[in-house]
Amino acid sequence: MSCFSSRLGASCGVRAFSCASACGPRPGRCCISAAPYRGISCYRGLSGGFGSRSVCGPFRSGSCGRSFGYRSGGVCGPSPPCITTVSVNESLLTPLNLEIDPNAQCVKHEEKEQIKCLNSKFAAFIDKVRFLEQQNKLLETKWQFYQNRKCCESNMEPLFEGYIEALRREAECVEADSGRLAAELNHVQESMEGYKKRYEEEVALRATSENEFVALKKDVDCAYLRKSDLEANAEALTQETDFLRQLYEEETRLLHSHISDTSVVVKMDNSRDLNMDCVVAEIKAQYDDIASRSRAEAESWYRTKCEEMKATVIRHGETLRRTREEINELNRMIQRLTAEIENAKCQNTKLEAAVTQSEQQGEAALTDARCKLAELEGALQKAKQDMACLLKEYQEVMNSKLGLDVEIITYRRLLEGEEQRLCEGVGSVNVCVSSSRGGVTCGGLTYGTTPGRQIASGPSVTGGSITVMAPDSCSPCQPRASSFTCGSSRSVRFA
């Protein structure tokens, strides 16, 4: 019986797989050959592999030497209808140097752990897909809600525009009233200026009248002083006249006393006789007449001036009273107009403040609405981006799931093909490994290996290649051709 061995090396630090089988036993002999193996995986960095050993014949296989991998025994082909005597060569009982890897049990345990890890990852991917589907439904619900909400929020802008237009019309009315009040204020100010000019003229006339009154008073004082001087002069003249009269009487008495003692006969002309009494009386009469006329003239002039001054004072007092009444009336009118102007200004200020506040509130509301709209648009855009990311992740998860499904199917087909070859007999197997990017086409098996290496059948075993030798008596098994695409970058083709 011929034995074949296979070895697959990897440069990336991963283990390869090996299989050892015996096909077509010769009568009376049993041969089991095995080679150390290393597992191979479709994922980089994932160590481990699998090994199988079966015996085609009417007996079950047994272990020789150290155990390795996992054992499987089976019968290939139909069993004979009856049990025949089996003769065993005793030389086969001697221990064989099979060069079995002592770490096969650890490798098997690692393979089981890796399969468990892959199953856990697959379950995690399925849970993630379900979670992403739920998130997708939630995002679709939010999207519909935001669309309906956008339609409802679009009615706010016309409402604010109408409110702002009403406030603008009110502001225009207030501006018109302000213009009218300003015109009235200008008219009142002009009237006030006219009254002010008249008041100033009246004040000037009053000052002129007072000056005239002072001048007339000075004239009256001068006339009174002149009258006093004249009275003093008249009194002085009267005293002087009395003194002269007394002096004349005394001289006359002395003369009479001297004459009484002498008697003289003198012839005198009576026409030359000086009558002092008449002269004095005449002079006195003249002075009295002059004084009385001066007094009468001064009194009449004083009375006339006093009457004129009284009339002027009464007239100016009446004019001043009327002017004061007009000034008081103008002051009351000015105060009333000033109060009305202040009230109008306060009302205008309040209306302007209300308009400004309304505009600010409207602008704030519009800004808030725009901000909310921008936030909603940003949230919508973010939701779209999240949905796109989730869809991308979902697609990646589905691609990973497809790759895992393909890998599982490939492992299953590989195991089934291996069992079938062990049962039916193994012929020549050509294994071709090629590297590719983006897709894998295989005839029933997919592995990962180093890029740029090819594995071909032949009699030699080199690093990074597989050499499979089978006897001519075993017909080659033809695996079913299948083709699929996954995200692996390397392929193994069996032909």
Swiss-Prot record:
Family: Belongs to the intermediate filament family.
Region (Coil 1A) location: 112-146
Top-level taxon of the source organism: Eukaryota
Lineage, highest ranks first: Eukaryota, Metazoa, Chordata, Craniata, Vertebrata
Full protein name: Keratin, type II cuticular 87
Region Coil 1B, residue ranges: 157-257
PANTHER family: GATA-TYPE DOMAIN-CONTAINING PROTEIN, KERATIN, TYPE II CUTICULAR HB3
Region entry Coil 2, spans: 275-418
Gene: Krt87
Domain called IF rod: residue spans: 111-422
CC terms in the record's Gene Ontology section: keratin filament
Quaternary structure note: Heterotetramer of two type I and two type II keratins.
Something else known: There are two types of hair/microfibrillar keratin, I (acidic) and II (neutral to basic).
Keywords from the UniProt entry: Coiled coil, Intermediate filament, Keratin
